């Protein structure tokens, strides 16, 4: 199965200051558990979509430091206020389904 996780607000806290983002360890542990059980993990972010800044190298270093196991890191996710998709799960619902207690 393929899982696609947003980065900011899903696996880490952020107030649009990516340098100050704090990882959600419990979420990262769950992602790593999925990875280790053979699931395909994609990390997807809109970092730089509005500003045009290339955050790829910084983001790769950051998620490596946090120990997030993944197969792909994709930038270029569009910025939006509401995302409608037939396969989307809200991060808070996913936390609840997986008994994750995330504090921001």
Q: What are these model-derived regions, one by one?
A:
Residues 1-104:
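Catalytic phosphate/metal-binding cores of nucleic-acid and nucleotide-processing enzymes, i.e., regions
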């Amino acid at each position: 199965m393929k899982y696609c996780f947003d980065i900011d607000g899903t696996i880490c806290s952020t107030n649009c200051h990516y340098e100050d983002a704090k990882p959600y360890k419990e979420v990262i542990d769950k992602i790593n558990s999925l990875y280790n059980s053979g699931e395909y993990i994609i990390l997807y972010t809109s970092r730089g979509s509005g500003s045009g800044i290339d955050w790829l190298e910084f983001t790769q270093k950051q998620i490596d430091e946090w120990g997030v196991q993944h197969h792909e890191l994709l930038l270029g996710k569009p910025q939006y206020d509401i995302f409608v998709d037939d396969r989307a799960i809200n991060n808070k619902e996913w936390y609840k389904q997986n008994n994750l207690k995330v504090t921001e």
